[in-house]
């Protein structure tokens, strides 16, 4: 009953995300039942991170100053016991992006790293391809994710055709979603925020609750596509937010496809 649990708890998610996706991320979190706050200034990030239920660090439009501020917020979240999710957007595309992510991982106790296959491969010194903020791999995403979790010393989420959640030992794979998600800017970044929201829930099964959140996200995308396939990507974007808001645990039970190993 994770969606119902999320909506009842209405967790505050501190999003230090990129300027391209801020509005979409906030609306997506509101739709699913979380409460977003976007705070970036050095003077307040620690205070905000202390009261938030989870912290998202998304480096999409990074600068040296923004990385410094993310580290301040991350350390504050660590002290408060709140989960920290790193979304290493474009890691592997430039040295600055890759090294900035590695610095965050060194200085902050990151709970989950969520990225596409190319980004995760770049951070864990595995083979992959990154083009701008898009990435791909030739290897098995499960093995990639498990290796990365052990190298990075954090849980890892690799999103793509199959969504993989692992702590390096146990694994949950989700099989929901739709290719049209790749035609709307910000859906990958929103999935990182969704991961942060579900990570904030107090549960005995951390991997399963994160996997559940990603499957729910994919179910919403599938339902949005069925509603708008004769219209196009713009209509899909709106329908997707609507479906996130309407989504129930019964929907996930009926349409969700995932397995654990």
Curated annotation (Swiss-Prot):
<dbReference type="Pfam" id="PF02110">
    <property type="entry name" value="HK"/>
</dbReference>
<keyword id="KW-0808">Transferase</keyword>
<dbReference type="InterPro" id="IPR029056">
    <property type="entry name" value="Ribokinase-like"/>
</dbReference>
<feature type="binding site">
    <location>
        <position position="38"/>
    </location>
    <ligand>
        <name>substrate</name>
    </ligand>
</feature>
<comment type="pathway">
    <text>Cofactor biosynthesis; thiamine diphosphate biosynthesis; 4-methyl-5-(2-phosphoethyl)-thiazole from 5-(2-hydroxyethyl)-4-methylthiazole: step 1/1.</text>
</comment>
<comment type="similarity">
    <text>Belongs to the Thz kinase family.</text>
</comment>
<keyword id="KW-0460">Magnesium</keyword>
<keyword id="KW-0418">Kinase</keyword>
<keyword id="KW-0547">Nucleotide-binding</keyword>
<dbReference type="GO" id="GO:0004417">
    <property type="term" value="F:hydroxyethylthiazole kinase activity"/>
</dbReference>
<dbReference type="GO" id="GO:0009229">
    <property type="term" value="P:thiamine diphosphate biosynthetic process"/>
</dbReference>
<feature type="binding site">
    <location>
        <position position="159"/>
    </location>
    <ligand>
        <name>ATP</name>
    </ligand>
</feature>
<dbReference type="GO" id="GO:0009228">
    <property type="term" value="P:thiamine biosynthetic process"/>
</dbReference>
<keyword id="KW-0784">Thiamine biosynthesis</keyword>
<dbReference type="GO" id="GO:0005524">
    <property type="term" value="F:ATP binding"/>
</dbReference>
<keyword id="KW-0479">Metal-binding</keyword>
<comment type="function">
    <text>Catalyzes the phosphorylation of the hydroxyl group of 4-methyl-5-beta-hydroxyethylthiazole (THZ).</text>
</comment>
<feature type="binding site">
    <location>
        <position position="114"/>
    </location>
    <ligand>
        <name>ATP</name>
    </ligand>
</feature>
<keyword id="KW-0067">ATP-binding</keyword>
<protein>
    <recommendedName>
        <fullName>Hydroxyethylthiazole kinase</fullName>
        <ecNumber>2.7.1.50</ecNumber>
    </recommendedName>
</protein>
<dbReference type="GO" id="GO:0000287">
    <property type="term" value="F:magnesium ion binding"/>
</dbReference>
<feature type="binding site">
    <location>
        <position position="186"/>
    </location>
    <ligand>
        <name>substrate</name>
    </ligand>
</feature>
<dbReference type="InterPro" id="IPR000417">
    <property type="entry name" value="Hyethyz_kinase"/>
</dbReference>
